[in-house]
């Protein structure tokens, strides 16, 4: 809603379903959590490799987690807590202090819905204030996340390839690549970035399907693909690659400056 306030919202049960819908319909945009400041990568890399959708933008969203329960419930009554694995990990100190049993579910909002429908006062969910309002739940404890500066990076993605014209803004270029199988391939492939003074903000490996000897790499760099130094660096990288694919060029979110 922050990004597309007038858009029709289509809920999906899984990340794979989100990617699949966008892959089948050019008019659909998906907003996918990619990484978290506390717990790191969310785990959608394999879907980025699988579908190769275009990235249009990034959005950083501050995260606050709340313990939600049925109206009239007290924290001392709670034995089981339900939420997405990331929310549970990000609230681990509170969970441990309260001696709660963790139960992993597909998402935070779905966990709140489960609590609302199951009508068991020994159960609670970790979710947002909006979920509490939607499902008529009490907020038993507010801001239970381990770190108060918690934030999640989201990617806005879709099927059509769209790229901003190079201007004065700060940009991120995102791409994936697979190296040729030879000694020191990764070391040699990254030399062009060092020589041309290009900063890599992310470099992550992921095993190719059914293999632990062949890897794809997911990379973000500071800059626009049309900048000469970026082009030279990527040309150098290409000499060492079996596969190379640009995922997107987009303005760097101002949150990065904080």
Model-based region annotation:
Residues 1-258:
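Domain-level signature for soluble enzymes in the chorismate/prephenate branch of the shikimate pathway
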């Amino acid at each position: 809603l922050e990004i597309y306030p007038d858009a029709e919202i289509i809920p999906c049960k899984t990340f794979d379903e989100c990617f699949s819908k966008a892959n089948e319909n050019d008019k659909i945009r998906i907003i996918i959590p990619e990484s978290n400041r506390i717990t790191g990568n969310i785990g959608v890399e394999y879907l980025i490799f699988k579908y190769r959708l275009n990235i249009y933008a990034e959005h950083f969203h501050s995260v606050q987690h709340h313990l939600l329960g049925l109206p009239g419930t007290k924290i001392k009554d709670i034995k089981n807590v339900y939420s997405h694995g990331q929310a549970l990990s990000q609230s681990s100190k509170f969970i441990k202090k309260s001696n709660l049993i963790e139960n992993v579910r597909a998402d935070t909002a779905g966990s709140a819905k489960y609590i609302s429908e199951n009508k068991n006062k020994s159960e609670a969910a970790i979710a947002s204030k909006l979920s509490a309002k939607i499902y008529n739940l009490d907020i038993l404890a507010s801001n239970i996340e381990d770190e108060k500066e918690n934030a999640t990076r989201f990617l806005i993605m879709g099927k059509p390839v769209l790229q901003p014209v190079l201007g004065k803004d700060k940009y991120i270029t995102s791409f994936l690549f697979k190296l040729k199988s030879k000694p020191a391939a990764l070391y040699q492939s990254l030399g062009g970035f060092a020589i041309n003074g290009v900063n890599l903000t992310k470099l992550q490996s992921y095993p190719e399907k059914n293999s632990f000897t062949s890897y794809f790499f997911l990379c973000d760099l500071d800059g626009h693909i049309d900048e000469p130094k970026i082009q030279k660096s990527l040309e150098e990288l290409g000499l060492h690659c079996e596969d190379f694919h640009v995922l997107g060029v987009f303005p760097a979110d101002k949150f990065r400056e904080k």
